[in-house]
């Protein structure tokens, strides 16, 4: 008499940033595919109502993070909110993932991550990548360009002001980053190892100057928006009124200087390769959000 065969449970996926734009979209897409992922959140009350497997932890709490990641096979690690100690938080969370036995981490990094990147926050992403590589955990890096969703938010009273010059940026929609992450995770869960150690550069379908982006915003929203060039000194002076710490002001200004440097003048096929569809243009993104 043959014994009944018991199938092993599917790999457990955990998603961080599940109450945010990218992590939340990935969580919803994975749920639609089934089974639903574990959501690692800072505040359980903000988790979506459908979530049954919710773990509470912050990136900087090693003990809580280790417990939250117990039994997890594949982890989407959405980069933490900008802060002075973000790198320390990232390293702590990666150490917790390794200790918990996580087999593979998909990390949302930044296009051009490097120790000397013009965009200051890209340096933190590079250091995070290096720590992830040293951890021994499997990895896939999604190096996103600036979010296209963020471009309209740069305007203050209809003016985008900064030292970006004629530089161009291949900004990518958050929705496309989420779809790309979901595709990678789906392959990993299915046992497809093509993404092991892979680095994907995710951009939109076009690289725009900020003046061109302002024109697109005007046409798509009906809100007159223009770009005004600033010197470096003007950029720092105009942002000093917010009382932000130096590291944050440096990050704000380097958003523009990174564009001016040409570092973000990139258009790749990363989104289409992973998702099978062309990425959204800024005009399409804004039309979808009307």
Model-assigned labels for residue ranges:
Residues 56-57, 92, 276:
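Hydrophobic transmembrane signal anchors and adjacent membrane-proximal interface regions, especially
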Residues 51-61:
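Rossmann-fold cofactor-recognition segment
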Residues 195, 233-290:
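A hydrophobic C-terminal alpha-helical subdomain
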Residues 2-47, 60-63, 70-72, 81-91, ...:
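Oxidoreductase cofactor-interface core, primarily capturing Rossmann-like NAD(P)-dependent enzymes
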């Amino acid at each position: 008499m043959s014994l009944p065969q018991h199938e092993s449970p599917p790999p457990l996926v955990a998603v961080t940033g599940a109450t945010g734009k990218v992590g939340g979209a990935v969580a919803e897409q994975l749920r639609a595919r089934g089974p639903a992922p574990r959501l690692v959140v800072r505040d359980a009350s903000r988790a979506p109502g459908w979530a049954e497997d919710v773990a509470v932890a912050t990136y900087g709490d090693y003990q809580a993070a280790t417990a939250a990641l117990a039994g997890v096979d594949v982890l989407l690690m959405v980069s933490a909110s900008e802060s002075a100690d973000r790198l320390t938080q990232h390293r702590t969370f990666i150490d917790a993932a390794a200790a918990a036995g996580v087999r593979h981490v998909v990390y949302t990094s930044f296009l051009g991550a490097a120790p000397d990147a013009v965009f200051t926050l890209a340096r933190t992403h590079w250091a995070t990548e290096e720590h992830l590589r040293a951890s021994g955990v499997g990895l896939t890096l999604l190096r996103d360009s600036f979010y296209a969703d963020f471009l309209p938010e740069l305007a203050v009273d209809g003016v985008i002001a900064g030292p970006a010059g004629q530089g161009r940026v291949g900004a990518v929609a958050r929705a496309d980053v989420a779809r790309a992450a979901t595709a990678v995770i789906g392959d990993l869960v299915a046992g497809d190892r093509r993404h092991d150690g892979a680095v994907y550069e995710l951009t939109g379908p076009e690289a725009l100057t900020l003046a061109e982006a302002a024109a697109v915003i005007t046409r798509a929203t009906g809100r007159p928006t223009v770009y005004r060039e600033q010197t470096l000194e003007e950029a720092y002076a105009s942002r000093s009124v917010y009382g932000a710490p130096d590291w944050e002001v440096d990050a704000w200004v380097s958003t523009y200087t990174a564009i001016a440097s040409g570092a973000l003048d990139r258009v790749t096929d990363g989104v289409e390769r992973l998702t099978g569809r062309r990425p959204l243009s800024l005009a399409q993104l804004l039309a979808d959000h009307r």
